[in-house]
């Protein structure tokens, strides 16, 4: 009987910056696996390595040692181009600062990950916007929508293409509680549909949306 690989697995991840007296160890031998349909919250004090862990998992930052596995295949040694391709196809990332391109419409912002791979799919854009409650917003520009709506656009961009891994770094940080709950509800629904999710948050009420919570301190799981 063959074991199905985890959508996302981190094996013995360590990450350090600087040299000599400026050397900083951000992560120390961290291992973590996320199942399909599971949302894992990562909590810990400022500087504990939460965002570094998410960046390594999202192939946005290379670990000093260890392996990131996507569906059982190591992605740690991919060059920058291949890492970006893998991220666009398999991983949706949501940040606190939604980073919408102001000169693109909402629909163009959402469809950008597909367009970078040469795919124009207006139906997929419409589905992603409908999923986050922004049906009909395609032709608006970022300056014409609220901060909460902009974060929902960022989520739609992360969801497009049925990605199997969703990573969220303090996605509710600039939002009020009710809007933050709405953001987490959308993330939770996609995870319940089979995606694997990692959520970095400092708010216990938002971590409550997760299936389990991991505490980081000084770059290590407690």
Predicted regions and their residues:
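ABC family nucleotide-binding domain
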Residues: 5-8, 13-213
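H-loop (His-switch) and adjacent beta-strand-loop-beta switch element
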Residues: 213-222
